C-alpha cells in the first residue's frame, strides 16, 4: 500500500519539478 502511494506522488512531483526546485532551496 505505501509503495503505490509513493510512486503516484513521485509522478506528480516530476511534473511540477520546475516550481518545486525553487521552493526546495
From Swiss-Prot:
Pfam families: Ribosomal_L41
One cellular-component annotation, GO: ribosome
Keyword Thylakoid: no
Region annotated Disordered, chain positions: 1-25
GO MF annotation, one: structural constituent of ribosome
Protein's UniProt keywords contain Protease: no
Keywords assigned: Ribonucleoprotein, Ribosomal protein
GO biological process, one term: translation
Miscellaneous: Initially thought to be part of the large ribosomal subunit. Crystal structures show eS32/eL41 to be a small ribosomal subunit forming a bridge at the interface of the 2 subunits.
Family as reported in the entry's similarity comment: Belongs to the eukaryotic ribosomal protein eS32 family.
Oligomeric and partner information: Component of the small ribosomal subunit.
Protein name: Small ribosomal subunit protein eS32
Gene of this entry: RPL41
Amino acid at each position: 500500500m505505501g509503495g503505490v502511494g509513493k510512486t503516484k506522488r513521485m509522478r506528480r512531483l516530476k511534473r511540477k519539478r520546475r516550481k518545486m526546485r525553487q521552493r526546495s532551496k
